[in-house]
């Protein structure tokens, strides 16, 4: 019997895909659930997957690899999609697909299956990764094939086969959670005029419900990588979990946005990324202290392209690897300490220092100084403004002004 490896979460979509694959393809279904920080959500999956018809379930702890090999490179690049989205779902998919391909090789499977819909970005992210890593594998995307057209249809399909799902028609939110973020889509969020309900938030609280007293914290970075919190060395996963807890308490990192999907439509999502928001704020502050103007400005352009690559699912590509090489060079001196103030949804800079700081108080002071000769500015302005002057003279001579 041919085998297929399914990206399994235990949610509505992947729960009904197991019997659907068996009924329509006759394949043995091997499920794989990636532990990216869901924690207790994965505990009941073994029993559920088997009851749904899978022959076995792999639960792969990918948290450390997720943070060090996917989150940190994106953090160092400063990649943010459309100015808001910190890419929590986007860079998780290439890692999941990578492990699916590895398990397929181990099990001798001929196909990979996923539960991403035909309207979303995840189908692209999964399938581009599979094509890049093993183009011989068949890819099955049930949402593009079957007669199920809505989440309500999917719920009915599950109920008919006795499959329990953590979704009801009264609250049909689609959620994706990992150690970096929690996303919410669907339901009443599909109308962008609807304000998210306060009980939507699971990683933290609404800013107005946050404590009335601010909290300060200090983060140490080494070559662009966070290594300690308040002077205590922490592993990558522990550091992020701690920041999620602290940031969530203060309502940090809630993003409500309408974004442009790769597949051509706009969608509305509400994202909770407390720890990630803290790290991005701190990392950016340290870069502003340690990077020269030319490098910083060019890196900002690279960040836009990097964000698009990650969002579009082109992680396993020569361009992303080349951009990583550039970013790594820029991070050599991004070492130091950042102090942040957390207060009612705001994460603001309260201090930054680095042994590689390019900030010189002697040059920057508005007081008396003997370092900077202000007369030098006149020659610079004359040369820098020469093209503007020449154009103005031409326009005056030709009667254009």
From Swiss-Prot:
User: InterPro entries per the record?
Assistant: Arginosuc_syn_C (IPR048268), Arginosuc_syn_N (IPR048267), Arginosuc_synth (IPR001518), Arginosuc_synth_CS (IPR018223), Arginosuc_synth_type_1_subfam (IPR023434), AS_cat/multimer_dom_body (IPR024074), Rossmann-like_a/b/a_fold (IPR014729)
* This enzyme's EC code(s): 6.3.4.5
Give the superkingdom in one word. Bacteria
Listed GO MF terms: argininosuccinate synthase activity; ATP binding
A Pfam short name = Arginosuc_syn_C
Q: Which CDD domains match?
A: ASS
Where's it found, cell-wise?
Cytoplasm
According to its UniProt entry, the protein's GO biological process terms are: argininosuccinate metabolic process; L-arginine biosynthetic process; urea cycle
Give the UniProt keywords, A-Z.
Amino-acid biosynthesis, Arginine biosynthesis, ATP-binding, Cytoplasm, Ligase, Nucleotide-binding
Residues annotated to bind ATP: 7-15, 34, 115
Q: Does the keyword Cytoplasm apply?
A: yes
Q: Which GO cellular component terms, listed alphabetically, does the Swiss-Prot or TrEMBL entry include? A: cytoplasm
The pathway is: Amino-acid biosynthesis; L-arginine biosynthesis; L-arginine from L-ornithine and carbamoyl phosphate: step 2/3
* Catalytic reaction annotation: L-citrulline + L-aspartate + ATP = 2-(N(omega)-L-arginino)succinate + AMP + diphosphate + H(+)
Instruction: Read off the SUPFAM superfamilies from this record.
Output: Adenine nucleotide alpha hydrolases-like (SSF52402), Argininosuccinate synthetase, C-terminal domain (SSF69864)
Q: Which residues are involved in binding L-aspartate? A: 117, 121-122
Residues reported in the UniProt entry to bind L-citrulline: 85, 90, 121, 125, 174, 183, 259, 271
Q: How does it assemble?
A: Homotetramer.
Which family does the entry's similarity section mention?
Belongs to the argininosuccinate synthase family. Type 1 subfamily.
What name has this protein been given in UniProt? Argininosuccinate synthase
Provide the species name.
Desulfitobacterium hafniense (strain DSM 10664 / DCB-2)
Q: Which gene produces this protein?
A: argG
């Amino acid at each position: 019997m041919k085998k297929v490896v399914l990206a399994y979460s235990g949610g509505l979509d992947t729960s009904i895909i197991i019997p659907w694959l068996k009924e329509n393809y006759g394949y043995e279904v091997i499920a794989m659930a990636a532990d990216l920080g869901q924690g207790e959500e994965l505990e009941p999956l073994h029993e559920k997957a088997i009851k749904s018809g899978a022959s076995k379930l792999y639960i792969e702890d990918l948290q450390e690899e997720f943070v060090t090999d996917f989150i940190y490179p994106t953090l160092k690049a400063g990649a943010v999609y459309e100015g808001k989205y910190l890419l929590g779902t986007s860079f998780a998919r290439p890692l999941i697909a990578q492990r699916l391909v590895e398990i397929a090789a181990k099990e001798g499977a001929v196909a990979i299956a996923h539960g991403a819909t035909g309207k979303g970005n995840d189908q692209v992210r999964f399938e581009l990764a599979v094509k890049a890593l093993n183009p011989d594998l068949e890819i099955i995307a049930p949402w593009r094939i079957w007669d199920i057209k809505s989440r309500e249809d999917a719920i009915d399909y599950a109920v008919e086969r006795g499959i329990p799902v953590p979704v009801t028609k009264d609250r049909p939110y689609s959620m994706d959670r990992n150690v970096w973020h929690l996303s919410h889509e669907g339901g009443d969020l599909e109308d962008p005029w609807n304000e998210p309900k306060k009980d939507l938030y699971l990683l933290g609280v609404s800013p107005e419900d946050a404590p009335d007293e601010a909290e300060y914290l200090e983060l140490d970075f080494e070559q662009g990588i966070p290594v300690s919190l308040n002077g205590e060395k922490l592993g990558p996963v522990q550091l992020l979990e701690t920041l999620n807890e602290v940031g969530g308490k203060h309502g940090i990192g809630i993003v409500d946005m309408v974004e442009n999907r790769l597949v051509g439509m706009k969608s509305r999502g509400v994202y909770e990324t407390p720890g990630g928001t803290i790290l991005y704020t701190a990392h950016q502050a340290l870069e502003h202290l340690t990077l020269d103007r030319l490098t910083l400005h060019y890196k900002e352009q690279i960040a836009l392209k990097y964000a698009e690559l990650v969002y579009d699912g082109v992680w396993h590509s020569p361009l992303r690897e080349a951009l990583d090489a550039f970013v790594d060079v820029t991070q050599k001196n991004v070492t130091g300490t950042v102090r942040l103030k957390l207060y009612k949804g705001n994460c603001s800079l309260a201090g930054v220092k680095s042994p590689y700081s390019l900030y010189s108080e002697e040059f920057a002071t508005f007081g008396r100084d003997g370092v900077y000769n202000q007369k030098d500015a006149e020659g610079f302005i004359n040369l820098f403004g020469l093209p503007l002057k020449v154009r103005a003279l031409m326009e005056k001579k030709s009667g254009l002004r």
